[in-house]
């Protein structure tokens, strides 16, 4: 199927697609900041340069675009039929032009994502993936972001349990009589 746009129009259209500071990423960042979570962006020292890094919790958040990262699973409220008897994410559709190119590109992206997530986990980082369709759709955005904050709070509690010193146990067996501060016969005047 031929492309409906000229090469110049297609180039202009594709050049406007952002890799950083996308709308879904900004929604997640604003919500996290409003709930007291401080973070760094696109940490170059970590595999895959994660979108959001919360060092204190050793957690990275990847905000993936459904098309570029090949998201095929639908979010719960609004799946789209794929014409083959199944459902898919409504933001992921394989282009009708240059199908081989796009399929290979998306598969490479998915493989790289898998490798980056595994590398981060091996380094001891918690990895959370949020899909574009989970924050683009208003009816599930709030639910997704609340779930994210609950997950981060749970990670924070787990870290606090690990860092908390062991409770020191004392032996309260009476080995000698305790000394009294005041004699029983003393009648203090108040």
Across the structure, where does each feature detected by a protein language model lie?
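Nucleic-acid endo/exonuclease domains
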Residues: 1-79, 83-129, 133-190
């Amino acid at each position: 199927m031929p492309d409906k746009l000229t090469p110049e129009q297609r180039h202009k259209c594709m050049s406007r697609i952002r890799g950083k500071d996308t709308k879904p990423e900004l929604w997640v960042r604003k919500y996290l900041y409003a709930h007291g979570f401080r973070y760094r962006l696109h940490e170059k020292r970590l595999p895959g340069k994660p979108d959001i890094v919360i060092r204190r919790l050793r957690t990275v958040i990847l905000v993936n675009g459904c098309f570029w990262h090949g998201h095929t699973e639908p979010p719960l409220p609004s799946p789209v039929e794929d014409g083959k008897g199944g459902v898919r994410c409504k933001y992921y559709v394989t282009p009708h032009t240059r199908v081989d190119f796009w399929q290979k590109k998306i598969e490479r992206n998915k493989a790289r994502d898998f490798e980056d997530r595994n590398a981060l986990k091996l380094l001891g980082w918690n990895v959370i993936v949020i899909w574009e369709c989970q924050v683009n759709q208003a009816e599930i955005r709030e639910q997704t972001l609340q779930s994210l904050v609950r997950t981060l709070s749970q990670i924070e509690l787990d870290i606090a349990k690990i860092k908390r010193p062991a409770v020191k146990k004392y032996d309260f067996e009476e080995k000698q009589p305790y000394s009294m501060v005041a004699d029983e016969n003393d009648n203090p005047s108040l």
